[in-house]
Amino acid sequence: MSFSLRIASRSAGGLGGRVLNRLSKLVSVRVATRPIAALFAAGLISWGSTADRVGSDGSALWSQLTVVGGPSVAVAENWPQWRGAKLDGISGEKNLPVKWSKTENVAWRLALPGPAGATPAVWGERIFLTSVTPEGQLVAMCVSTAGKELWRKTIAEGNKDVRGDEGNSASPSPVTDGEHVWVLMGNGQLACFTVDGQEVWKFNLQERYGKLNIAFGLTASPLLDGGRLYLQLIHGEGNPATREACVVALDKLTGKELWKRDRDSDAKAECEHSYASPVLYRDGKVEYLLTHGADFVIAHSLEDGRELWRCGELNPKSNYNPTLRFVASPVAVPGLIVVPSAKNGPVFGVKPDAKGDITAVAEAFAWKRPLNTPDVPSPLVHEGLVYLCRENGNLIVMDAKTGEQIYEKRTVADRHRASPVYADGKIYLTARKGIVTVVKAGREFEILASNELGESISASPAISNGRIYIRSFDALYAIGK
């Protein structure tokens, strides 16, 4: 008897010894009583013939192992940053719970010091979060997958709530590579810790790049890829003569700037501000960073940040809305980039081989949808379908190739701030009042469950270890066994 197991290697070169030496840090593999190296030596595990690069880490590889015979093997995927390993909201985890409540199918609940909109990052047996405290401290936390707090570090003082309960200074999501964790706060404080809680470096973005002029605070999460940390700082004071937006790449281990590029636009007023996060496009042939805001989505070279292409008319100049700030981020899958806008504006399906200014280049688009963008939740693409969760709870499903609408149905009539995630044939949609609607993936609309926790939620779910981790304003829940 044999079956395949896919594990992650952080080496783009030889896949042998380095994977074995660091396997426990990269993926949770449990093999009955025998060390994995011994299984290789015994011929019970062998490297498969294929290996393909996936994930947001540019050096990460999925390599196929073939496991022969008896041992019981289980693999848990990591969720290292906002929207998961590939920044697309997709998890390969199976046998996840469909129904739960505050008491049913909850492995544990850990009370947290205060609210946050940041999605947890999960690696192995550690979960990383941010929070504010009642005293206004901005803290980073590490929690075990058993639900025990391992450490807590104060990053800065002085929380700032925005728009009532819509956000605070703990909105950007942490990122981790299993050895370090990087935490960004709404006041610009950026810090790197070891996973054991030892500070490596810390500085404030505003001291390096100038005051952040953004109405509702910094919410863009950092993006980790290989040895680099990417940040989009899209903001401004509404003065076209002083454009302040920039994109930067930092060395993840030192915080040293590797490159910085000004991000030009002609956006006006509040449109200069962006609350979206950067994403990557990578398909084995081309790769680049995508930044979203100030009326444009722009692709940048990973090496030096130079602009490769841009797309405008997301805020049409013929009917310009000076309050149209982007919150939802694009989602990129091989062959397609789905670009949202804001406030019932358009959604574009962009072909990834774009070059230059594609705004008026018809052949650069797979399709265009003139209305019904999600205002806050980011799109999801899976198996040829595009899922748009609108802020009112409506779910729109479209054909990814043509943009044709398949259906639009109501889930929960409430604000939706979290982005949808997919796992095990299901789409998980999180309403602000604490209800998670589980919808069957596919062309037919079917609600499988409506699960109420009774606590406010803005963070997107994280999926790992056979569980769904949900960060409410009050607590962290581990949903599952």
Go through the PLM ranges and name each one.
Residues A32-W47, Q64-G70:
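Bacterial N-terminal signal peptides
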Residues L61-K481:
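Noncatalytic, solvent-exposed loop/strand surfaces
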Residues S4-A8, L39, A60, V75, ...:
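Hydrophobic alpha-helical context, especially transmembrane and signal-peptide helices
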Residues M1-V31, A51, S56-D57:
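N-terminal secretory signal peptides that target proteins for export/translocation
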